[in-house]
């Protein structure tokens, strides 16, 4: 029986033999489609190839693409664990043709793989085609010998594939497997098609049109093929199973869950184990691809999946975090096919453990609240939306988690009520995914790249060069010239200006032609082009002209120093904190650097000092900074760190810095820092000058941020600090060496004086004032006092003294400070069952025009804006006591 790993390999090997390039799975966070939350099909990374906006050095491709469907249009979360074939994470096997072959080859490829390589009996297969697609039907009859009754024509959109409201589309043919009459269900298109007898295993899309926003369709530049076959589904078939969760891979994760919770994998907790197994995959792969749990966007979807799995672990009786203990089982199954899983294992485990630990603090209380709410409702009534919102807002229960919990009890949620309470938050979430604005003007950059090719970057070796102006874009439109006052983007055939990427900001400088000048204010990338953002300062600039280009040298030098220091900082952090540290973002600007990295807690002062010292040690060593060009695989084999979120081509730049015996990295195994990086760097580490860490802060959940200065900026910062120290020393009339002791003495002296002042205030307050004698009100002694200028923080002590004076009774203290009142009330312990200080102080506050007040039955405080009615406040309290 083939394993899922075997099936994946068989698929890819088949298409490799048939001239296809095996392309790595793209990340779950789409690189080229801002409208998608997660990659949800194999064709996502090839979308621009289908539309003709992107060309690659191959026209046939095959992939095993990791996908997530849990949020937005494609959302399988609610059904996961309860059905045989729903998943949040799945693998999509696919083969693709970009204007190479079409139906006449795609159909034979599919038939041969299924019937020969996978050895599926021919008589078990049937297909559907779009009702007008006579060509596909004819090919199926010719290639597979299928009779007409096993080639079913479907007139609905089930056989016309569209990625969304816009984009590539076309008719498709779906291949089904017939499990036989012992399983209920009818063929596709019949009234009983929802049964499990006929299961779709492969969808072949004949990509021939593009759908536009106005509803019209135009032919694609070239006819293409996009196919998709779920690995879990074909795996179940080839392993003789009717349930994806019974395949070898899923079964191993289910058994790991059962072992970790000491429960039966097939007992009453079967559904819980299935949810955990599925969600373990989606959460682990999302974390490996850089998504961290948060309260918005992708991070919120990740958190929802995590918490759903954690609730099911809780229902299995798990008292401690479980999910992180299952990661090794997942890595054993899938780490070979997806190395990023192995590389990120430590971070995945730490993130899962931290999130589960946090959620468990509120899970029990939230579930108790849910039970209490249900107990108050009539049998079968839905949970009010307000209660569901409270579970979300107070206990961190996403709505679908509450729905999942109620599902087991046959209950539902008043979703409309919940949505009303969540309106503001949902508006923010929608805004987060309304698109980045890149889509509408991307076509012009594709068009220019098609016409002119990519910009050649010369800036590794020079800061001055000449280039030819290929195009000028103003307001998203290709224009014939630019004049003073205009802000435009200029495209050149080559440039020394670095375009913003990898955390390094774009260069600035000057462009000169025979007829004009422009100030370059920024440079960014778009479809391989370097977009020079320019303000024309004099004359006229036109496409076709030659241009002299000069980068701002001082600014570039400062950026280089910061970028190189970032590499040293990354390695020093890994050595100080552990290999789980991975870059999650950076900013290398001329005036500062910022480095975001995966780590779950704040760095101590000692850890920061250790990291800073190590960075400066290597700066002082003044070692060479070397760059080599090699393949990504060779770079990783040498131990190079890849920059998070970057897409690498067939060749990469590998930057090495410093020497460290026994590091195991680099050509000699003794390189300190080794990273894949396309940025600009210093020639020698000594060129950085100095690195000063300003501090460490939280960037997001599980991500820390360090900010630092280098070179002249670091020196200026230290000089400023020294100047401040000198000013403080002069103020203290102490030498720098004596400053600490002097400050400590002043702090202690201040503390003593504050205590003395507080004591004097208490003595002055207790020494007299209006209503200073206790009254007897209905057998209760009541002592009220009006004082001047006593701060609220001193009043509890005075209340204690007043209670001591009366022995048994109630007391009230009103302090008048610039016309505003601070109030405190007290009740001796023997009377708190009859009187509450909270009620007394609220009555006094209301008499003074205030509201509220709070505390304990024996002591409470409040405030009010008008102290002039203090006597009325006393009378109000007397009324409460006598009432």
Curated annotation (Swiss-Prot):
Enzymatic class: ligase
Residues given in the record as Zn(2+) binding sites: 563, 567, 677, 681
Subcellular location: Cytoplasm
Co-factor requirement: Zn(2+)
GO BP terms in the entry: alanyl-tRNA aminoacylation; negative regulation of DNA-templated transcription
GO cellular component: cytosol
GO molecular function per UniProt: alanine-tRNA ligase activity; aminoacyl-tRNA deacylase activity; ATP binding; tRNA binding; zinc ion binding
Record EC number: 6.1.1.7
CDD domains: AlaRS_core
Record-linked InterPro entries: aa-tRNA-synth_II/BPL/LPL, Ala-tRNA-lgiase_IIc, Ala-tRNA-ligase_IIc_anticod-bd, Ala-tRNA-synth_IIc_core, Ala-tRNA-synth_IIc_N, Ala-tRNA_ligase, Ala_tRNA_ligase_euk/bac, DHHA1_dom
Cofactor: how and how many bound: Binds 1 zinc ion per subunit.
Pfam families attached to this UniProt entry: DHHA1, tRNA-synt_2c, tRNA_SAD
RNA-binding among keywords: yes
Catalytic activity, reaction form: tRNA(Ala) + L-alanine + ATP = L-alanyl-tRNA(Ala) + AMP + diphosphate
SMART domains recorded: tRNA_SAD (SM00863)
UniProt entry keywords in alphabetical sequence: Aminoacyl-tRNA synthetase, ATP-binding, Cytoplasm, Ligase, Metal-binding, Nucleotide-binding, Protein biosynthesis, RNA-binding, tRNA-binding, Zinc
Keyword Ligase in annotation: yes
Superkingdom of origin organism: Bacteria
Function description: Catalyzes the attachment of alanine to tRNA(Ala) in a two-step reaction: alanine is first activated by ATP to form Ala-AMP and then transferred to the acceptor end of tRNA(Ala). Also edits incorrectly charged Ser-tRNA(Ala) and Gly-tRNA(Ala) via its editing domain.
Recorded domain comment: Consists of three domains; the N-terminal catalytic domain, the editing domain and the C-terminal C-Ala domain. The editing domain removes incorrectly charged amino acids, while the C-Ala domain, along with tRNA(Ala), serves as a bridge to cooperatively bring together the editing and aminoacylation centers thus stimulating deacylation of misacylated tRNAs.
Protein family: Belongs to the class-II aminoacyl-tRNA synthetase family.
Protein name: Alanine--tRNA ligase
Species of provenance: Cereibacter sphaeroides (strain ATCC 17025 / ATH 2.4.3)
Gene: alaS
């Amino acid at each position: 029986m083939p394993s899922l790993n075997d099936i994946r390999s068989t698929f890819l090997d088949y298409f490799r033999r048939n001239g296809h390039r095996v392309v790595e799975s793209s990340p779950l966070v789409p690189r080229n489609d801002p409208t998608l939350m997660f990659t949800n099909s194999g064709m996502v990374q090839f979308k621009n190839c289908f539309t003709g906006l992107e060309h690659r050095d191959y026209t046939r491709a095959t992939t095993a693409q990791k996908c997530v469907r849990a949020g937005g249009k494609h959302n399988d979360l609610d059904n996961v664990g309860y059905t045989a074939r729903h998943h949040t994470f799945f693998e999509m096997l696919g083969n693709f043709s970009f204007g190479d072959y079409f139906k006449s080859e795609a159909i034979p490829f599919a038939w041969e793989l299924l019937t020969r390589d996978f050895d599926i009996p021919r008589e078990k297969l049937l297909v559907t085609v779009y009702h007008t697609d006579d060509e596909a039907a004819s090919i199926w009859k010719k290639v597979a010998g299928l009779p007409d009754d096993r080639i079913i024509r479907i007139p609905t959109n089930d056989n016309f594939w569209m990625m969304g409201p816009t984009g590539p589309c076309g008719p498709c043919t779906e291949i089904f497997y017939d499990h036989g009459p012992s399983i209920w269900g009818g063929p596709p298109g019949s009234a009983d098609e929802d049964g499990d007898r006929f299961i779709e295993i492969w969808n072949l899309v004949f990509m021939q049109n593009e759908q536009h926003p106005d509803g019209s369709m135009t032919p694609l530049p070239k006819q293409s093929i996009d196919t998709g076959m779920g690995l879990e589904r074909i795996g179940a078939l080839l392993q003789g199973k009717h349930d994806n969760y019974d395949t070898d891979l899923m079964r191993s994760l289910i058994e790991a869950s059962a072992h970790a919770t000491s429960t039966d994998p097939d007992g009453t907790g079967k559904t819980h184990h299935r949810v955990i197994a599925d969600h373990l995959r989606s959460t682990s792969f999302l974390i490996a691809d850089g998504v961290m749990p948060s309260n918005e966007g992708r991070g919120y979807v990740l958190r929802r999946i995590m918490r759903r799995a954690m609730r099911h672990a809780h229902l299995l009786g798990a008292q401690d975090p479980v999910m992180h203990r299952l990661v090794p089982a997942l890595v054993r199954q899938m780490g070979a096919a997806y190395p990023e899983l192995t590389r990120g294992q430590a971070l995945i485990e730490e993130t899962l453990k931290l999130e589960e630990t946090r959620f468990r603090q509120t899970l029990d209380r939230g579930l108790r609240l849910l039970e209490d709410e249900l107990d108050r409702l009539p049998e079968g009534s839905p949970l009010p939306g307000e209660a569901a919102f409270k579970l979300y807002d107070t206990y961190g229960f996403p709505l679908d988690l509450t729905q999942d919990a109620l599902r087991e009890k046959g209950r539902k949620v008043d979703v409309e009520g919940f949505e009303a309470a969540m309106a503001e938050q949902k508006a923010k979430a929608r805004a987060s995914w309304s698109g980045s604005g890149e889509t509408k003007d991307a076509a012009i950059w594709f068009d220019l790249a098609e016409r002119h090719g990519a910009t050649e970057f010369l800036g590794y070796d020079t800061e001055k060069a000449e280039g030819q102006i290929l195009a000028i874009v103003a307001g998203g439109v290709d224009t014939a010239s630019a004049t003073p006052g205009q802000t435009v983007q200029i495209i050149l055939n080559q440039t020394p200006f670095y375009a913003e990427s990898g955390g390094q900001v774009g260069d600035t400088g000057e462009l000169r032609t025979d007829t004009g000048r422009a100030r370059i204010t920024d440079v960014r990338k778009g479809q391989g082009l370097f977009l020079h953002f320019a303000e024309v300062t004099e004359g006229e600039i036109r496409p076709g002209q030659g241009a002299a280009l000069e980068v701002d040298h001082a600014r570039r030098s400062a950026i280089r120093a910061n970028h190189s220091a970032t590499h040293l900082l990354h390695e020093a952090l890994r050595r100080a904190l552990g290999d789980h540290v991975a870059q999650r973002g950076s900013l290398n600007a001329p005036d500062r650097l910022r480095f975001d990295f995966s780590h779950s807690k704040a760095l101590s002062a000692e850890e920061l000092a250790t990291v800073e010292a190590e960075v400066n040690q290597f700066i002082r060593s003044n070692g060479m900074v070397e760059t080599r060009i090699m393949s990504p695989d060779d770079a990783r084999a040498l131990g190079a760190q890849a920059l998070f979120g970057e897409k690498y081509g067939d060749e990469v730049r590998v930057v090495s810095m410093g020497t460290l015996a026994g590091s195991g990295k680099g050509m000699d195994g003794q390189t300190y820092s080794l990273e894949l990086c396309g940025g600009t760097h210093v020639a020698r580490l000594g060129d950085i000058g100095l690195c000063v860490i300003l501090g460490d802060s939280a960037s997001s959940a599980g991500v820390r941020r360090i900010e630092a200065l280098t070179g002249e900026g670091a020196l200026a910062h230290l000089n400023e600090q020294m100047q401040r120290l000198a000013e403080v020393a002069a103020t203290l009339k102490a030498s720098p060496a004596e400053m600490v002791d002097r400050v400590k003495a002043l702090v202690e002296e201040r503390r003593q004086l504050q205590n003395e002042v507080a004591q004097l205030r208490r003595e002055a307050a207790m020494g007299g004032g209006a209503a200073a004698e206790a009254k007897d009100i209905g057998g209760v002694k009541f002592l009220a006092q009006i004082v001047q200028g006593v701060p609220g923080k001193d009043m509890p002590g005075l209340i204690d003294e007043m209670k001591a004076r009366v022995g048994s009774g109630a007391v009230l203290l009103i302090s008048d400070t610039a016309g505003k009142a601070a109030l405190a009330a007290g009740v001796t312990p023997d009377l708190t069952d009859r009187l509450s200080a909270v009620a007394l102080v609220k009555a006094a506050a209301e008499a003074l025009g205030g509201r509220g007040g709070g505390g304990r039955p024996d002591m409470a405080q409040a405030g009010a804006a008008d102290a002039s009615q203090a006597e009325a406040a006393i009378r109000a309290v007397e009324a409460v006591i006598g009432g």
